[in-house]
Amino acid sequence: MKQYLELVNEILKDGEKREDRTNTGTISKFGVQKRYDLREGFPLLTTKKVFYKAIFHEMLWFIKGDTNIKYLVENNVKIWNEWPYENFKKSSEFNNETLQEFVERLKNDNEFCNKWGDLGPVYGKQWRDFGGIDQFAKLINDIKKNPFSRRHIVSAWNPAEVDNMLLPPCHSFWQVYVSKDGWLDLQLYQRSGDVFLGVPFNIASYALLMELIAKECNLKARYFVHTIGDAHIYLNHLEQINEQLKRKPLPLCKIKINSEKSIFDIAFEDIEIEGYESHAKITGEVAV
């Protein structure tokens, strides 16, 4: 995906070095935008291998309105583990358990998981219950009834509850646009984007969301417009980022939704990726 590599080069060229909340340090650029045409293929990064199963599970978890990571850890999705673990470490119950021991206890102890596996009122809660409003169901209904409305909006940023979230929403606000000839576009505003670890996930995640909404509403997915406020590369990811820049993007894969079920009932097994080829995996530490 050349757009992603263009974003990386823009940040390295024009960004500024900044201190950050995690004390890792970043190179940051404010206000960037990239456009991905889903008609050309599913925008799953090819310059490093991406664990797309985690992306699919997470999106279904959002749609269900879930905020406890039990479903994720049971499906070997590790992307949220560090935040509840760091929260647990601050408690009087912490007894020097490792992260892996913490995760295993979440899997096997429901009472412990109910207490320590919840992230607070994060994405799923806001999508499905923003002050009593099911934004997601309303969006689907409104697209079907009034497709050309300019009010097809879902917000995960709730100022009344943001301080109760273990991590305030990075991808915080999105809007859907329906063209007169049956195409569905989506623009995401992301307040903060970890370009090495997070942004490749976010691109594929919202592309999947587009495909799911389009199928539900009898439309076709077209443009994903990704707007990022603080787009940053952590300083401890520079070696990995430069390795990616040496790699040539490969052809994009395809995605299929093999079900006629409602978007609210779609399961992981209903989603299929065809022809995904990538360069080797590149790892990096998450900044918490």
Swiss-Prot record:
| Recorded catalytic activity of this chain's protein | dUMP + (6R)-5,10-methylene-5,6,7,8-tetrahydrofolate = 7,8-dihydrofolate + dTMP
Annotated residues that bind dUMP are located at: R21, R150, R151, R191, S192, G193, D194, N202, H232, I233, Y234
The UniProt keyword set, sorted, is: Cytoplasm, Methyltransferase, Nucleotide biosynthesis, Transferase
Q: Which superkingdom?
A: Bacteria
What's the Enzyme Commission number for this chain? 2.1.1.45
Q: Which residues form the active site?
A: C170
UniProt GO BP: dTMP biosynthetic process; dTTP biosynthetic process; methylation
**Which pathway?**
Pyrimidine metabolism; dTTP biosynthesis
The broad enzyme category this protein falls into is: transferase
Can you tell me which residues bind (6R)-5,10-methylene-5,6,7,8-tetrahydrofolate? D194, A287
Where is it located? Cytoplasm
What GO molecular function annotation could you give as one example from this UniProt entry? thymidylate synthase activity
Listed under GO cellular component are:
cytosol
> According to its UniProt entry, what is the function of this protein?
Catalyzes the reductive methylation of 2'-deoxyuridine-5'-monophosphate (dUMP) to 2'-deoxythymidine-5'-monophosphate (dTMP) while utilizing 5,10-methylenetetrahydrofolate (mTHF) as the methyl donor and reductant in the reaction, yielding dihydrofolate (DHF) as a by-product. This enzymatic reaction provides an intracellular de novo source of dTMP, an essential precursor for DNA biosynthesis.
Q: Which PANTHER family match?
A: THYMIDYLATE SYNTHASE, THYMIDYLATE SYNTHASE 1
According to its UniProt record, which protein family does this protein belong to? Answer: Belongs to the thymidylate synthase family. Bacterial-type ThyA subfamily.
Q: Subunit composition?
A: Homodimer.
| Record's protein name | Thymidylate synthase
- The scientific name of the source species is Mesoplasma florum (strain ATCC 33453 / NBRC 100688 / NCTC 11704 / L1)
